[in-house]
Amino acid sequence: MPSLAQQLSEQNAGARERIPTDTLAVMDAATDQVASSGLVDSAVGVGARAPEFTLPDAGGTKVALADLLTNGPVVLAFYRGGWCPYCNLELRALQAALPEIEAAGGTLVAISPELPDNSLSTKERLDLAFTVLSDVGNEVAERYGLVFTIPEALRAVYDGFGIDLPASNGDDSFRLPVPATYVLAPDGTVAWRFAHPDYTKRAEPADVIAALRAL
């Protein structure tokens, strides 16, 4: 099976062949803006205490990070939403790696700003066996320092793609998290982190598993 990086690269190459040049320019400029903002560098990093949270899962049940940590290390995967093909590839790859993640002692949780009903749709569509949480309003992603606002020009592009963020997220803030993956030690400190301003780049599940095994 190809690595997640290979799958993401193929998805991106195909998209760039289909999408008009002027539209790509808008998308690339928005990614460059996130990169130049320094957001990723200032986000919660290795050695820091992971901000606590309690969020609803896809079924509406409240899930607290503190409770998850009582079972051992926790893997947090912040993603943009089920409308994002790169997120779907990442979630599928994490599902495929779930047995190894759990064998290494980890509890995997994915977090997006989507409403619980939309998170449930993503969970069912991708047949995910791990917990998917709804961070409506990006309050938790904000605590981790991962949130940015989508520029007006990119909003128009998303509209053209049929992506309705206000409907997905339940607000019109047009804010999203930078995709990021954290491995938390049982004491709640960040043992490993992957975050990238380019949303087509994601943590490789093998690296997540290696980080868990290194604890």
Regions found by a protein language model. Give the residues of each.
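A short, polar/charged loop-to-alpha-helix boundary motif
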Residues: 197-215
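Short active-site neighborhood of thiol/selenol oxidoreductases, capturing the structured segment around
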Residues: 65-94
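Thiol/selenol-based redox catalytic cores and closely related redox-interacting motifs
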Residues: 51, 135-201
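Structural microenvironment flanking redox-active thiols in thiol-disulfide oxidoreductases
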Residues: 90-143
